[in-house]
Amino acid sequence: MKKQKMSLKHLKKYQKESVLAPLFKLLEALMDLTVPLVIAQIIKNGIGQNDMGFVLKMFGILLLLAVLGMAFSFTAQWFAAKASTGYATDLRQELFDNIQDLTYAELDQLGTDTLITRMTSDVLQVQTGLNLALRLLLRSPFIVFGAMIVAFTIDVKSALIFVVTIPVLAIVIFTIMWISIPLYTKVQSALDKLLGTLRENLLGVRVIRAFRKEDAEVQQFNQENDTLTQYNEHVGRLSALMNPLTYILINVAIITLIYVGAFRVDGGIIAQADVVALYNLMALIIVELIKLSSLIITINKSLASLERIEAVLVVKREMVYPIEPVKEDASAPAVIFDQVSFSYPQAGADAISNISFVANRGETIGIIGGTGCGKSTVVQLIPRFYDVQSGKVCVNGVDVKDYPQGELVAKVGMIPQKAVLFEGTIRENMQWGKEDATDEEIWHALEIAQAADVVRSKNGLDAMIEQNGRNLSGGQKQRLTIARALLKNPEILIMDDSASALDFATDLKLRRAIHNLGNQMTVFIVSQRASTVRAANQILVLDDGNLVGIGTHDELMENCKVYQEIYYSQFPEEKPKEVMA
């Protein structure tokens, strides 16, 4: 309940709409409750007395009630729509803002697919539930109990049928509601999993076809789709009980009402018009209870969705950034790793263990090792994408945990393994690195990144990039992301295997161009190519999360067996004969 109160705080902005929408629906309900009484008067005093003037007068009143009811309904719908859409917009914005603030570890734990579902499907479900609740949550009970009260004014004994029927119906409805809430949560979770599989297949369709795995993927999708279908069918069967049970109870009540009413009319206690009025009141109750049952089903779905949204909103951010700027040591090395160990959430074993090294300002640091040895993990700790479990990472002599987020981010230019570009012009993508970058600055960065020719071939900086850079090759995307990072002019440039799609000649030109900048930029190059890191001032050799070698290329060729194996596997022609033997 506390979680739901947290989300409902956004309704404070729409207090007026949240009050006026139910109020106008109550006014509409009042019009509906008046109609059976007017009809009874038409039958009793108009038709019964053959008074056409009275009939026409009552017809005018019925018409007025209809017009007023329609006006009240339209106004209520307008206020309800304004409140629900506004609330959903604010909730979606808060959810998006919260996701933007989550750490990499928290994002990994929640998962991309479930976040997308909660941002879209769940928020829409909450919006629908709120809209219906504002319109019907008070209106339907008001008509049900109002009709019962009006029935007592007509005939007390006949009204007792209403007294018995309504509580029984309430028990049926709320029992089904109580059982169905957990099922809707399972439906949304199954939808998360299905969307995850769908997203994975769409992104990896070329790989799937290359390995002829279409049938296996279809089978997996069908299994997850069947699971979702089973949950939906379970919910559907349960929900399907609602209307039949309510109809049975209502029909029994109507038959009883007509039966009792007939005896009381014969006894002269009530008139035929009163029985008609009682029947119309019961019909009103039927309609509203059906609406109420549908509303409860929708509210159940909305509450399940709201709970899933709250699970993201209440995530307590573990990574806290200071506000005060730090005092750096101008004489300190650019980066220091001091006995650093780190493991990913729920991974068990450490990704890296007891890593220690010093990177001086202006140096190029190469990081090499086999797949999964922890290369990317090391460089992701420098901009504090994750917090270390033990040890310390320092930038310019200051622990990265002591830096304000903006200050640390400004110092580090990160080029990830997967080149990410956004839909828009090349200029717009480049200006992610520097918002006010001039065309001259952009072209300079493109020249260094060996991407200038690519841009010229695309008709310049105003050429459009499709979503995820679909209209560019892998190497072109990598060069553009490198140029974007260079525009930032960072103190520390991290290239996390970001030139893997480049040919050897272009890769060499790129490294030489960065080296020839002549500034004090410290460069980290993560690669599986020995040729890429060979000229680095220091090379870190990782094996299964451990630092097994550190030094220059020549030093490592002398004393690091892992580095020798990597190098000779790529340059077998340089392997000495005695080693080959």
Feature-to-residue mapping (PLM):
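An intracellular "coupling" helix at the cytosolic face of ABC transporter transmembrane type-1 domains
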Residues: 10-16, 101-105, 121-130, 134, ...
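Transmembrane helix-loop-helix hairpins at lipid-water interfaces of multipass membrane proteins
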Residues: 12, 18-75, 79, 152-157, ...
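Hydrophobic alpha-helical transmembrane segments of ABC transporter permease domains
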Residues: 23, 27, 31-35, 72, ...
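Juxtamembrane helix-loop junctions of ABC transporter transmembrane domains
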Residues: 23-24, 31-44, 65-112, 116, ...
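Helix-loop-helix
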Residues: 51-60, 150-164, 234-307, 312-313
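Helix-loop junctions and hydrophobic alpha-helical segments within the transmembrane domains
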Residues: 95, 99, 208, 309, ...
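Pre-NBD coupling/linker segments of ABC/ABC-like ATPases
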Residues: 317-330
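ABC-type nucleotide-binding domain
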Residues: 329-581
